[in-house]
Amino acid sequence: MASTADFKNGLVLVIDGQLWQIVEFQHVKPGKGPAFVRTKLKNVLSGKVVDKTYNAGVKVETATVDRRDTTYLYRDGSDFVFMDSQDYEQHPLPESLVGDAARFLLEGMPVQVAFHNGSPLYIELPVSVEMEVTHTEPGLQGDRSSAGTKPATVETGAEIQVPLFINTGDKLKVDTRDGSYLGRVNA
């Protein structure tokens, strides 16, 4: 059990027998009336996102989630294979469980896999990754960093928006949460 004061992003709650992860939350103390906590919850299995409001201080049931450090090894058909960094056990996870994170998975990448009662729930990528641009249209003479964006394909096949001065072969830093361009990496 946890109080609303213990809420943090990533905490997994048990609501009506289902597991919900806190995506974001906000403590609100209005000038009139009691304080409350506004949350955005994501169903761990279905991916459905809902908004839920709790009165401040309410106790909620939390799930015991074991986060393990793993390394992404390879893709095997529709499964993604991860190796536990402690016992070297391999865990094949289905594409449905990996979800949108597959866009930024590179072989050898360190990834955290969350388990509940021995079953994998979801994966957590590093916040940013370095990737090489495999294709983008060439920039024009006089392009500046703030002049706009263009699509670029990175080595995993994901398409992201990058500034006009980025060329094929450049190494970029990409935010894995939303796929946004963070900067160019000096080689």
From Swiss-Prot:
InterPro entries: Elong-fact-P_C, NA-bd_OB-fold, Rib_uL2_dom2, Transl_elong_fac_P/YeiP, Transl_elong_KOW-like, Transl_elong_P/YeiP_cen, Transl_elong_P/YeiP_CS, Transl_elongation_fac_P. Pathway: Protein biosynthesis; polypeptide chain elongation. One of its GO terms (biological process) is peptide biosynthetic process. The keyword Protein biosynthesis applies. It is found in: Cytoplasm. Pfam families: EFP (PF01132), EFP_N (PF08207), Elong-fact-P_C (PF09285). One of its GO terms (molecular function) is translation elongation factor activity. GO terms for cellular component: cytoplasm. The keyword Chaperone does not apply. Keywords: Cytoplasm, Elongation factor, Protein biosynthesis. Involved in peptide bond synthesis. Stimulates efficient translation and peptide-bond synthesis on native or reconstituted 70S ribosomes in vitro. Probably functions indirectly by altering the affinity of the ribosome for aminoacyl-tRNA, thus increasing their reactivity as acceptors for peptidyl transferase. NCBIfam families: efp, PRK00529.1. Belongs to the elongation factor P family. PANTHER family: ELONGATION FACTOR P (PTHR30053), ELONGATION FACTOR P (EF-P) FAMILY PROTEIN (PTHR30053:SF12). This is Elongation factor P. It comes from Mycolicibacterium paratuberculosis (strain ATCC BAA-968 / K-10).
